[in-house]
Amino acid sequence: MSPQPSRSPDRFSLAALAEDHPTAPAQGDESESLPCVNAQRGEPNLRVVDCSGARRDEEVAVEEVLIPYAHGSDPEDVPGEPPKSRWWLSSGAAVAMHVAIIGALVWVMPTPAELNLGHGELPKTMQVNFVQLEKKAEPTPQPPAAAPEPTPPKIEEPKPEPPKPKPVEKPKPKPKPKPKPVENAIPKAKPKPEPKPKPEPEPSTEASSQPSPSSAAPPPAPTVGQSTPGAQTAPSGSQGPAGLPSGSLNDSDIKPLRMDPPVYPRMAQARGIEGRVKVLFTITSDGRIDDIQVLESVPSRMFDREVRQAMAKWRFEPRVSGGKIVARQATKMFFFKIEKRR
């Protein structure tokens, strides 16, 4: 591998020249011409000069190599004359060795495509423009948010006072309806019953509006939860709308066995409500109560349930008419009053 030319193309390695062209013993001032290294440029040949005049021993020969220069490069160097000093030779050899090493490295290392210049061409200049980056605009400090104005407390409007409850007016008792005359059905011929001895009257809790002379004592005064009998709606022996004989419980042919009074409702008693209930009912052939109908209720539906519950437990003796047990209708008036303590 031959070294590439550098900025000093006339300097080469002395060692390479010595190996390729060994020197011969000098005789007098004779010199041996070497082939021209820079023959392409037309530079003069190198000469190896034998310094025989300065040797002390015949066996030792000192050879000096003169580094050629281009014609007219240095006016002081004259071809054929010895060098000025020895240090110039050593320094030139060192420089040549460094140049050769650098040239070898440059040859081996790949060069960029831009730097592959032709012979005698100058490297192209590269223009570099420095751009100054704009500084980021600092965010402008925002003014502190104004504190929200305190909202005035809402003034609560005074709530209107609830209206006072109106006092409950006691219902006025309705006038008793006049009993309508019942059309008598066609009377059928009935066999006359055999006369029986009259039984002794049993004390009862009912009494008619007009006390009968047969009763031994007047009925007890009404108390809370007790009832008093009502007036007759039809005379004894008459028939009701269903074709059954009707009358009042005061009739002698109606004999009760069990008559529990109704219970006074707690709500009505607590409010001091009094009233009355009139019912029409049927006494079956086995002495039970059936078909209870409310004819009058004051206040409306206040005591109806208690009356029905009490009458469901009533029992009567079967009524015999013409040798047969028959059913009949009857009416009853219940009064609900509160005893006042003295």
Curated annotation (Swiss-Prot):
It is a single-pass membrane protein. It holds the Pfam family TonB_C. One of its GO terms (cellular component) is plasma membrane protein complex. Signal peptide: none annotated. Residues 1-39, 136-260 are annotated as: Disordered. InterPro entries: TonB, TonB-dependent_transducer, TonB/TolA_C, TonB_C. GO terms for molecular function: energy transducer activity. Residues 1-87 are cytoplasmic. Residues 249-342 form the TonB C-terminal domain. Residues 154-172, 191-201 have a biased composition (Basic and acidic residues). Sequence repeats lie at residues 157-158, 159-160, 161-162, 164-165, 166-167, 168-169, 170-171, 172-173, 174-175, 176-177, 178-179, 180-181, 190-191, 192-193, 194-195, 196-197, 198-199, 202-203. Disulfide bonds: none annotated. PANTHER family: PROTEIN TONB, PROTEIN TONB-RELATED. This is Protein TonB. It comes from Pseudomonas aeruginosa (strain ATCC 15692 / DSM 22644 / CIP 104116 / JCM 14847 / LMG 12228 / 1C / PRS 101 / PAO1).
